[in-house]
């Protein structure tokens, strides 16, 4: 039988072990806490340094941007002067007229010596598939365009080519009441290029009939863009810097050059350079501008003088 002294000694040993454990735990937790505090302090310092670097880069970028804007603004009149002189252009809205885009395009052409667009057409979209089919089938010369059901890409191709060529335009004459919302200018003169503004965007829908109408409209618009491009003249799709719905992906998909900030000085310069035959690409300030702000700038050839 254990005596009292042994029992007391055992209890003392247990309490001593507990005390040592508590002291060690406190020491270790203190060290861990110190380590965590040190880590947090180092992380805060690292993030602070990184933020400072980003802020410095942002300031530098803003300063470069302001300098570039100032340079473009100062050189704009010289770079634009007569760049499009004696050239004629068509302005095409794939949807209703956008006043802001129209004003920017007209300003571009005026600044570059071209004057107002020779003709402007705004399409009435989405198309009414049944009415368009009926109109096509009622004319022997147009009936073939209705053979593909709701695919009007072939019709769009020929409409685009007619729009550039001018002169007699049998397709536009026959279908204007169905396809044209607004027009201005003359249709008789050939143009040297076209500016396109896609001002209509298809709304999301689960309605089968409406989805068919949207597909038919898209096929017509894509065909028209291809038809314009097939002429070999410059075709440029444009939008303003603040456009809610961007059409740049559509232009890019069809191989059409684009400017996404036509309502700015740099955008107007980019448009003029492209219409003058500059390097094709997607220009502007948005993420879609894969080729920079403006195309490479070439000098305007001096006017020819007699001997």
Predicted feature residues:
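Hydrophobic membrane-insertion alpha-helices, especially the h-region
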Residues: 9-25
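Long, leucine- and charge-enriched amphipathic alpha-helices
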Residues: 30-79
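A substrate-binding/cap region within the structured catalytic cores of diverse enzymes
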Residues: 124-216, 220-223
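Loop/turn elements at helix/coil->beta-strand transitions in domains of secreted/extracellular proteins
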Residues: 115-116, 190-194, 231-234
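Signal peptide-directed extracytoplasmic domains
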Residues: 59-88, 94-155
